């Protein structure tokens, strides 16, 4: 089998991606998961949901290719999938859809310990006088860890970040949640439980602590 995928546009979001594989047996049906060649800068810059057209070409045993055009949605960077539909091909050729909870993986993708705003936040935390340095777990005491986290908390509190429950997405779905990026949380001074947790976890990881969402 050979599969080619290409999106439209002057600068394609997905450049031509070719995937070839050999089935274990001469099956009447096969499911393929080609690795697509994305333009990651476009993905990162997407702040509005929009449609894109994909041309998919498949051929078997070097035969005449079959081409299908599909319209997909390019979701904005803030749309975080919490559930996905997994496909499993049964022996009778029927594709069975199964729902999987992936929130534990996808929400963690919004944690970014290398965000450029974090060094400034840490500097402001030191300026509070609550602590002399960020040592992570090196001092070996719970009180040391709590003092470091408390200094960070006070800086975020001083910035006036307030709770704001905005989790509805474009084409709202129960399987997708809107999550603010760190720069969005800091600039708007708004966060819900996920946004705030991602920000706080990012800072904690930066100073060498283990953080979990």
Tell what function each PLM region has.
Residues 191:
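Long, structured stretches of catalytic cores involved in phosphate-ester chemistry, encompassing
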Residues 99-188:
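Secondary-structure boundary elements
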Residues 1-87:
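Beta-strand-enriched, solvent-exposed domains that form extended recognition/catalytic surfaces
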Residues 48, 145, 196:
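Hydrophobic (often cysteine-bearing) scaffold residues that line and stabilize catalytic clefts
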Residues 174-175, 194-213:
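Hydrophobic/aromatic-rich core segments of domains that either
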Residues 56-60, 152-156, 160, 200, ...:
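Hydrophobic, Leu/Ile/Phe/Ala-enriched alpha-helical segments that form helix-helix packing faces
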Residues 83-97:
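Short, surface-exposed secondary-structure junctions/capping segments
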